[in-house]
């Protein structure tokens, strides 16, 4: 889901508001693109390039939205735990703990919760509990200096503090290669000294973040990739292709890739 840029006050209906915040709840992870380049021809809504400020602006809106959700859960749990049901006592205590954490401006994913508390929170579909990848969007001519780029360092430090992932890519380059044929694209990337495109880098990071892998099936007329959770066993992987394959699964055979080729 491509969510348009959020502004201050989005959690209270400013800009594109709550409608777009609700779309994020349906996602498995959030890819947060952060501007890390200077260009006088591209105006910034706040008048300057400051990755830390931009990240804080978005994160606070998500935190505010989550505070509203947790507050409603807390009110409901407080009313129901009077019945003596321990379920609602635990829910109220978890909501109180998490609300205090959110109130300090921190995302839910950094709150130290027990397994039981996390199981409760998982059912609330909080925005700031979702795994995040920060994408530092750099200029085309900054690719050689990613590791020494101060703006990228800022994003990486924030990602580290939040237990999030971070990749640096140039959206400008991605736009240029999007319309190229495969051979032309490979040659272009080679000239830039890049092993793989930013999109491929981002996809790999997303797979890692969500604990996913792919396996391939190949035939005379089709080659296809199937996405499964890391650690999925062979019968369940076969079931992704067709349920009959899982029901009738007999065995998996290990073959060296060189032999397969």
Give residue ranges: language-model regions.
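Conserved phosphoryl-transfer catalytic core
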Residues: 67-74
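Active-site-proximal flexible loops/turns
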Residues: 9, 42, 73, 144, ...
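Residue-level signature of catalytic and energy-coupling elements of molecular machines
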Residues: 2, 20, 31, 70, ...
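C-terminal-of-GTPase-core extension/linker across diverse P-loop GTPases
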Residues: 76-261
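A ubiquitous short alpha-helical element
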Residues: 58-62, 171
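Substrate-engagement module of ASCE P-loop NTPases
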Residues: 26, 61, 66, 157-162
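Switch II of P-loop NTPase G domains
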Residues: 1-32, 36-59, 113-124, 148-151
């Amino acid at each position: 889901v491509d969510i348009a840029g959020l502004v201050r006050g989005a959690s209270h209906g400013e800009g594109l508001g709550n409608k777009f915040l609700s779309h994020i709840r349906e996602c498995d992870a959030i890819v947060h693109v952060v501007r890390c380049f200077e260009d006088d021809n591209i105006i910034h809504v706040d008048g300057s390039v400051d990755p830390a400020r931009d990240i804080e602006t978005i994160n606070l809106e998500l935190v505010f939205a989550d505070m509203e959700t947790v507050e409603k859960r807390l009110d409901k749990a407080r009313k129901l735990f009077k019945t003596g049901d321990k379920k609602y006592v635990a829910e109220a205590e978890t909501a109180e703990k998490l609300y205090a954490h959110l109130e300090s401006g921190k995302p839910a994913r950094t709150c130290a919760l027990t397994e039981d508390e996390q199981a409760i929170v998982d059912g609330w579909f909080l925005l700031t509990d979702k795994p995040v990848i920060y994408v530092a969007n750099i200029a085309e001519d900054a690719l050689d200096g990613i590791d020494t780029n101060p703006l990228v360092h800022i994003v990486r430090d924030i990602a580290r503090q939040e237990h999030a992932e971070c990749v640096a890519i140039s959206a400008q380059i991605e736009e240029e290669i999007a319309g190229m044929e495969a051979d032309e694209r490979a040659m272009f990337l080679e000239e830039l000294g890049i092993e793989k495109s930013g999109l491929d880098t981002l996809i790999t990071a997303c797979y890692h973040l969500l604990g996913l892998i792919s396996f391939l099936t190949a035939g005379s007329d089709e080659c296809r990739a199937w996405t499964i959770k890391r650690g999925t066993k062979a019968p369940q992987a076969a079931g992704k292709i067709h349920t009959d394959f899982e029901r009738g699964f007999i065995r998996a055979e290990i073959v060296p890739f060189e032999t397969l080729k």
